[in-house]
Amino acid sequence: MSEGDVARARAALAAFGTGDLDRLVRLFHPDFVGVVPPELSAEPDTYRGHAGIRRYVESFREYVDGLRFVPEDVIDAGDAVVVAMRIEGRGRGSGVPFEQRLANHITVRDGLIDSMTAYATIDEALAA
């Protein structure tokens, strides 16, 4: 990955928590595929295209206040970018804070995020 691709991955993760879906969607390829596996979510799913990005963010907003995606380590993994990160927020109804740590394996095509797959550990994401 180029430095520009690493910067795009950082920008995309930062944009998730801004609430600006139009800005976020512009960072993703129209053929984007995102995967959230069952071990990381009560509602695992595959998100496709710009509509998938919107659906993913809106599903969080329905239940979470103060949503933040916080990159902790960004690694140029050759043909991908791997980002160790945490997701933070508070339950909308309960106010209970939560934090989830994970690692994303991200690919870039034509200067846009093409795929993003979540893994439980950075080692799993690096091996993908």
Question: What are the residue ranges of the model-derived segments?
Answer:
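C-terminal and inter-domain tail/linker signature
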Residues: 1-128
